[in-house]
Every structure is written in C-alpha cells, then in structure tokens.
C-alpha cells in the first residue's frame, strides 16, 4: 500500500538525528589507530568498506535455461543465477570480512524466466496460502541489504509486486515511484545502513533507490491512475541533500537506468530513460551509482560532477547474475566525521565459480516443478521452425506468432463495427535461439518464442501510418552498398537498435532496400497484390509494449484502441496450440518481405 507520512517514518525508524537506520554491521579498519611518524603524530583513522551489487536478475536462480531445458550457455560462456552470485558473495565476505560489506541490487528481479512466471501465474505468490517467491527466498538467504525497483517488477501487476515486497527481508527502494493521488513515495525512497567500526564511530551508508520513468509507458495498464514516475535526476536532487543532512557519510544510488543518456520512448516523456550518468554529472553528493536496466557490462565508469568537481564511480554488472559489482570505498576520519577518500569499482564473473549448494538446495523443489511444467507436451508441429535467421529473413517462426495474433484479434472483433477491416499483425524476433521442432511440441518450446510478458491489443491505423511504421522499423539495418559483401552478423542492430525493436508486419508485402538511407527504404509495399492505399484503414494486432510507445514507433501509441487482452501473448500462443493440437506450418508460412539492394535480393 502507498506510504503515508506516519507509516513512512515508522518504517524508516528515524533516530534523534533524523537518520533512517536499517541495521548495523561491525567492521575492521583498513588501518589501525595508533601513533606514527615524527613527534608521535596520531595516524588518521581509516576504514575500508565494500558494497557488492547485482542487477537485472530477471528471475534467474539456477544456471539453467528453461527454454532449452539445459544448463545456460552463450557464445561468451557466461553463467547465470543467484546460486552463482551467492558463491561470489561468500568469497568476498570471507576476504573482506562480512561486517565490512553490503549487498544491493538495481532492479528487474521477478520477471524473465519460466521460474518467475510460474510463481506469478501458475502457482502465484498472491494466492491464498501461496508460496514465497523463489527470488525472495534466495535473496533473503544470501543476505541482501536493499534493492531498487525495476520496470519489469510491474509486469505482473502491483499486487504481485507488493506481495514480493512483503516477502523480502530487505527494503525495495524507488524514490521516483509516487502514489498518483498523494504524490508521496509508493515505496521506501532510501535506507541508511549503520556500519560499526572498532573506533566507536559508525559509518552511515545511504542507499537511494531510483526506478525507470518508462514504466508509465511500458506498464501503463498496471500503473495508470495508481503511480507516477518522475525523472531520476529530479528525485535524486531532492533526496541526496536530505541524506547528507541526515548524516550520511556515503551515498550510493541503485538506479534502474542505463548510463547512455538516451530514451527508447523519444519525447513521449520529459524524463530520460537511461539517466544514470546524468544523475552523477548533475547531482552533487553522490559517491557511487549501481547502474541497471541496460544489460551492459561496465566494470568502472567515472563521471565528474559539474557542481562539486568530484568523481562519481558507476558500475553495471551486466544481467541475470552474470557479474557481481564490487565498489571499494576508502574512508578517513576527518573534521569529526567519516569522509570518502577513494572509490573504485570492478566486476567479478560468475562463470568462475560453482553454484552455492545452499541456494540450489533451498529451491530444488521449485526448480523441478517448473522443469516438469515447461516440458509438458501440448501439440505437434508439421515442420521445424527456427529463429536463427529471423532478424534478416521472413521465417515461418515469426509468421506463426503473427498468425496466432491475427486470428485472435479477428475473433475478438467479430460482430463489432470494425469486423470487416483487414487485420495485420506485428511481431519481433525476441530470441534468435528460439526453435520449435517437428513432431511433439512442449510448453517451453512455444514459450521460448515470446519471453516477455506482453499482452495483445488491436489498433486502428491507415496505410500511410503503416508505411511510416515500417520505415521506422527498417532503421534496424546497416546501410550496405549494392555489390558489397554482406555479413549477417553485422547487418542488423544499426544505431544499437535491439532485436525486439525491429518489427515485421504480416498481411502486407514489401521490400527493404538496405542500400538506401533510413527513412526511404520501404519499396513495393502492397496489400493483396495492389499498391497500399494510404487512406485505407487496417487493424494492427500489436503487443502492449509497442502500443504504449515502447520503441517510439510512429502513430501506434496515439492510434485508436479497438480491443485489448490481459492474457500474455505467450499464453495465447500456448492456448492456441493446445486448442488446435497441431501446428500446420504450410497453412501460414510465406515470404512476404525481403531485403534488397537496388531491387536485387540480398539473400
């Protein structure tokens, strides 16, 4: 429930100095107090503190890929999961002394794997007598001190998030998540940890949590009218001086926001999506920022604050528990308080250690339940469908997603005023490793096509708007001159556009001329064999992320909504396969778009 002034103060347990103290840990000094130097001058008191950080865990406890039913592996041979992180954390605590360390997270915790999905939807933590979320159990056992709220925390709705918050032994922080009516904090903005030293003078470490303002777009259906999300810079400027005035010696921000200064949603919001470096540059008083959201590995990135001239150290530990950030703080006792003398950061790779059996043993039953669930056979397929080339070729696997979406929307609009309009469909290649085999098909194989918690909508668009939509999508390809060699590995993701922000639209035929400048690449655009009529109206089956403005595609966010569904598209596809019993690939697979250069096909 949103915090009011009274219960906020009660929950932060303010002291006489007005400082929120959420626990105390003892410490061993980096340099003992004593006499040294000429004249018996007393040495300065120094202390070393290490703050560890994770981010974007996305439901990963085990080093396991539920979609492939095997241990996780990628081209870089990364490992994933909190069980691996727990081993690293244990090693750091053994080296530094547990009392000299803290452990925090920068958000996106409860969405992303079939494990997290199972305990949100199949055996939900919100049910009567429901289970404790596996991520809460693991993080509690490891001993987290605080975690920021990520945007994907809202994917399953606020009740699920609140239940997860209740199950955690550590606070969830989000200074820029406000109750829509009172504009008071909807979560705890910060926590201050008191770290005890043998000098009798505690170090007060403030952790400020900031989430992503894009939640207002991406999870509009779950948060509209309930919460608002102002900018990171604005809220950091409000809270950091307060934390310093409360006596914080160290200020760390856990920010679910990348460091690039860019926004995938363009000018739809006045707040920057990836604002961590801007916060460091413009808000004085911050010592370090644990960065999240961007799924990037940043061992150490130093930003000079424009007002104070001091350097702020940023670090982002990639994603999924693949890395653990270590911030090492050197503190010195000066002028009656602890001062930060030095800060450095680095990351540890979780593929260098074994899983902590304490964590795997704690959740092995939950893991086995989910493995059994995803391996249920739900139908058959007449042919293999693979996404390996789906980013640059029209493939049956994307056609399948679009076929199910279009059929679902047509059925939903039957008997309405728009039932006679042609239905098109939008889909992206979310995973290039997704594959559906010929023969028996399981839940995990179908679920692997759609790893996100998106839901389906129907939007009304004109031919001209669809043309602009496709042109925007085609920016994804690197401009390649006619006759030049083509390397598929280097052909896509121009301007750092991720695969999920490149859309294929089924129901139309078109070519993408990658020899042309972005904005003029769509050629031979037609509908049912005739040039597309700019004035004609169409229904577009589209996911809620795109319909809400995700990716900043033109027109769709402001278009008329004809229908919306609360069921995840993944489950819609699974339900379709269960109902049909078989996937007849020949019934929907066709090549309707292709890449060209001056009219010559690239492939």
Predicted segment positions?
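Acidic, glycine-rich low-complexity/disordered segments
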Residues: 364-375
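Short, solvent-exposed loop/turn motifs
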Residues: 202-204, 386, 509, 531
């Amino acid at each position: 429930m949103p915090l009011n002034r009274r219960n906020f103060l009660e929950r932060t347990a303010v002291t006489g100095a007005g400082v929120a103290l959420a626990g105390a840990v003892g410490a061993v000094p980096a340099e003992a107090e004593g006499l040294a130097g000429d004249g018996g001058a007393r040495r300065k008191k120094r202390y070393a503190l290490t703050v560890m950080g994770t981010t974007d865990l996305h439901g990963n406890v085990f080093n396991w890929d539920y979609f492939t039913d095997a241990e996780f592996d990628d081209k870089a041979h990364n490992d994933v999961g909190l069980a691996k992180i727990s081993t690293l954390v244990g090693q750091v605590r053994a080296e530094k002394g547990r009392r000299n360390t803290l452990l925090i997270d920068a958000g996106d915790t409860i969405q992303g794997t079939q494990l997290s999905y199972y305990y949100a939807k199949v055996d939900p933590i919100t049910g009567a007598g429901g289970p404790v979320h596996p991520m809460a159990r693991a993080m509690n056992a490891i001993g987290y001190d605080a975690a920021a709220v990520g945007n994907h925390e809202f994917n399953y709705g606020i009740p699920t998030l609140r239940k997860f918050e209740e199950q955690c032994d550590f606070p969830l922080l989000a200074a820029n998540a406000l109750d829509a009516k009172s504009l008071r904090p909807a979560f705890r903005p910060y926590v201050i940890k008191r770290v005890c030293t043998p000098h009798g003078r505690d170090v007060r470490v403030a952790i400020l949590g900031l989430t992503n303002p894009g939640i207002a777009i991406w999870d509009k259906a779950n948060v509209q009218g309930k919460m608002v999300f102002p900018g990171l810079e604005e809220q950091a400027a409000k809270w950091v001086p307060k934390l310093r005035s409360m006596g914080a010696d160290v200020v760390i921000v856990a920010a679910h926001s990348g460091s690039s200064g860019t926004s995938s949603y363009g000018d739809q919001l006045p707040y920057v999506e990836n604002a961590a470096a801007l916060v460091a540059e413009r808000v004085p008083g911050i010592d370090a920022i644990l960065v999240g959201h961007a799924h990037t590995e940043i061992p150490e990135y130093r930003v000079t604050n424009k007002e104070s001239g001091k350097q702020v150290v940023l670090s982002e530990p990639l994603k999924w528990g693949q890395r653990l950030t270590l911030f090492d703080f050197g503190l010195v006792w000066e002028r009656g308080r602890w001062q930060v003398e030095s800060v450095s950061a680095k990351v540890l790779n979780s593929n260098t250690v074994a899983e902590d059996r304490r964590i795997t043993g704690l959740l092995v039953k939950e893991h086995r339940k989910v493995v059994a669930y995803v391996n249920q056979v739900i139908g058959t397929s007449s042919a293999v469908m693979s996404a390996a080339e789906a980013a640059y070729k029209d493939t049956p696997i994307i056609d399948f997603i679009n076929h199910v979406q279009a059929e679902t929307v047509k059925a939903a609009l039957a008997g309405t005023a728009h039932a006679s309009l042609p239905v098109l469909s939008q889909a992206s290649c979310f995973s290039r490793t997704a594959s559906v085999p010929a023969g028996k098909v399981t839940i995990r194989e179908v679920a692997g096509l759609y790893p996100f918690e998106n839901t389906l909508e129907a939007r009304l668009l004109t031919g001209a708007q669809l043309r602009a939509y496709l042109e925007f999508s085609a920016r994804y390809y690197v401009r390649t001159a006619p006759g030049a060699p083509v390397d598929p590995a280097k052909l896509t993701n121009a301007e750092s556009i991720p695969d999920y922000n490149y859309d294929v639209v089924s129901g139309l035929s078109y070519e993408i001329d990658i020899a042309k400048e972005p904005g003029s690449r769509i050629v031979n655009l037609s509908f049912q064999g005739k040039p597309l009529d700019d004035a004609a109206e169409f229904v577009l089956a589209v996911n809620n992320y795109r319909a809400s403005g995700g990716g900043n595609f033109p027109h769709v966010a402001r278009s008329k909504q004809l229908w919306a569904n609360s069921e995840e598209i993944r489950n819609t596809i699974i339900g379709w396969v269960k109902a049909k019993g078989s996937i007849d690939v020949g019934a929907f697979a066709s090549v309707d778009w292709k890449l060209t250069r001056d009219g010559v096909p690239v492939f």
